[in-house]
Amino acid sequence: MAALRAGKTNNEADQPSSPVLRFGADKPLKLDAGTLLSPFQIAYQTYGTLNDARSNAILVCHALTGDQHVANTNPVTGKPGWWEVLIGPGRIIDTNRFFVICSNVIGGCLGSTGPASTNPATGKPYGLDLPVITIRDMVRAQQMLIDHFGIEKLFCVLGGSMGGMQVLEWASSYPERVFSALPIATGARHSSQNIAFHEVGRQAVMADPDWHGGKYFENGKRPEKGLAVARMAAHITYLSEAALHRKFGRNLQDREALTFGFDADFQIESYLRHQGMTFVDRFDANSYLYMTRSMDYFDLAADHGGRLADAFAGTKTRFCLVSFTSDWLFPTEESRSIVHALNAAGASVSFVEIETDRGHDAFLLDEPELFAAINGFIGSAARARGLSA
């Protein structure tokens, strides 16, 4: 936690606690912004063992505020990996059977090149000098990481939310390298409503007087208040009205009566403030700007002449899409439109809509129906791939 609070830079940005793959000037990353990023690095974690045929590799793609620590203790927060409930020895994604890879996306803040990383041209953090990063840029970098392992074809690519966008981009850009794909709680484009919520968050960050045009590391104080407010606003979209009512209702926080002031009278107010305060301990404000922008720019149909089915033309990848009934960030109709496009493209696709009131974040929680869907799809794909149980 102190690694992000203290000093002028984030140590994890340049020298992460996880393995890191560095690319020099001879291997630049081509960006959609029309520039080349060089040098750059990718921080990652792996679990399990790659088999001799290199056919058992699963790539896990993280969401907006996630990282590579999917199934191990996070070195910054000290908390368990964000999907340890799903991934590990003997779990649904069994690391005794599969080789699991998860990388921090380009633009992130836990070891892959991002705005908190040192710009070799200046010796200072990039800040806003880093070109805007897209979902496709993230996937291009991941593809270079997969090449490093000598893996020609991934057995499965899976992820939720922004991770699901990466899954779709993988299946579209590199269909020959993806045997199966599992996009969860996601969409093929970001809606105007979602862009609006992101813009509120970005403006909260940029309105913080400590932001200094993104050069806050040089001033020794980060825009924590703005980032906390951005997180509070975003966190509401990850939940559902039913879940909020069940957990908080209009219950008061550590008091028996209203204070007639502006302290956190209600439990929900206290909860959101806590979410904001803990978030700034583990995430970089500029990375938040970059990550939200990458999601806003994502529009798979627009990248293929306006017809989503053309993004998957001729694909032989097996797909399973999962949505949640109470997810109003990426509602079920978003997944259905992807399923319709895959059907039009002649792809092998299944679709699971899970009844739950836990909202968008259900994909990160202990959700038995989700686990059953993943288990069934992975098992079927493994048999088709010829992977032994």
Swiss-Prot record:
Any one biological process term the GO annotation gives: methionine biosynthetic process
Highest taxon, organism lineage: Bacteria
Disulphide bonds in the chain: none
Record keyword Transmembrane helix present: no
Catalysis: reaction(s): L-homoserine + acetyl-CoA = O-acetyl-L-homoserine + CoA
Keyword Nuclease attributed: no
GO MF term (any one): homoserine O-acetyltransferase activity
Binding residues for substrate: 231, 361
Subcellular compartments: Cytoplasm
InterPro entries reported for this sequence: AB_hydrolase_1, AB_hydrolase_fold, HAT_MetX-like
Active site, per annotation: 161 (nucleophile), 327, 360
Domain AB hydrolase-1: 56-366
Keywords: Acyltransferase, Amino-acid biosynthesis, Cytoplasm, Methionine biosynthesis, Transferase
Enzyme class, UniProt record, top EC level: transferase
EC number: 2.3.1.31
Summary of the function given for this chain in its UniProt record: Transfers an acetyl group from acetyl-CoA to L-homoserine, forming acetyl-L-homoserine.
Subunit structure: Homodimer.
Name assigned to this protein: Homoserine O-acetyltransferase
Source species of the chain: Mesorhizobium japonicum (strain LMG 29417 / CECT 9101 / MAFF 303099) (Mesorhizobium loti (strain MAFF 303099))
Gene that this sequence comes from: metXA
